[in-house]
């Protein structure tokens, strides 16, 4: 089987947590995870409404930690600046964290695996919507 690399965004982990889909569906992918996604998931643990929600979110955060973390380095920051420049020129606004996740994918030459439409308008970003 040919394995394809992809960067799973925060929505994918939230979808797994909410059991909207089975993670085995993505057996053909080698997942990476942005440090931005890790931060968003950790924030979810810290801001959970109660102990049950916190435990569920912690489990999701720990799942995400099992995948290759992709950090923000000079290549990612360059990709981010170019991406945001193009978006601003087109008068498009996207969530700031999503722009960093997209830049991470672009810098590493991999697609983003997502449930969101936030990446649809982003130039040069390969998106796999689930």
From Swiss-Prot:
Q: Which UniProt keywords apply?
A: Hydrolase, Magnesium, Metal-binding, Nuclease, RNA-binding, Secreted, Toxin-antitoxin system
Top-level taxon of the source organism: Bacteria
Q: What positions does the entry give for Mg(2+) binding?
A: 9, 98
What is any one of the record's Gene Ontology cellular component terms? extracellular region
Q: Where are the transmembrane segments?
A: none
Give the SUPFAM superfamilies listed for this entry.
PIN domain-like
EC number(s) on file: 3.1.-.-
From its record, what is one biological process in GO terms?
symbiont-mediated perturbation of host process
**Xref: InterPro entries:** PIN-like_dom_sf, PIN_dom, Type_II_TA_system_RNase, VapC_family
Which PANTHER family does UniProt cross-reference here?
Answer: RIBONUCLEASE VAPC2
Q: How does it assemble?
A: Interacts with cognate antitoxin VapB4.
Q: What is this protein called?
A: Ribonuclease VapC4
Give the organism the record lists: Mycobacterium tuberculosis (strain ATCC 25618 / H37Rv)
């Amino acid at each position: 089987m040919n394995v394809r690399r992809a960067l799973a965004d925060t929505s994918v982990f939230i979808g797994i947590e909410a059991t909207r889909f089975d993670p085995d569906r993505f057996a053909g992918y080698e997942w990476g995870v942005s440090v931005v996604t890790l931060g968003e998931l950790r924030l979810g643990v810290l801001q959970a409404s109660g102990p049950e929600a916190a435990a569920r979110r912690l489990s999701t955060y720990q799942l995400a930690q099992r995948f290759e973390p992709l950090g923000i380095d000079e290549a990612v920051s360059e990709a981010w600046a170019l991406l945001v420049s193009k978006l601003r020129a087109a008068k498009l606004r996207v969530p700031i964290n999503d722009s960093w996740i997209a830049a991470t994918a672009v810098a590493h030459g991999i697609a983003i695996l997502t449930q969101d439409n936030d990446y649809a308008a982003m130039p040069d970003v390969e998106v796999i919507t689930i």
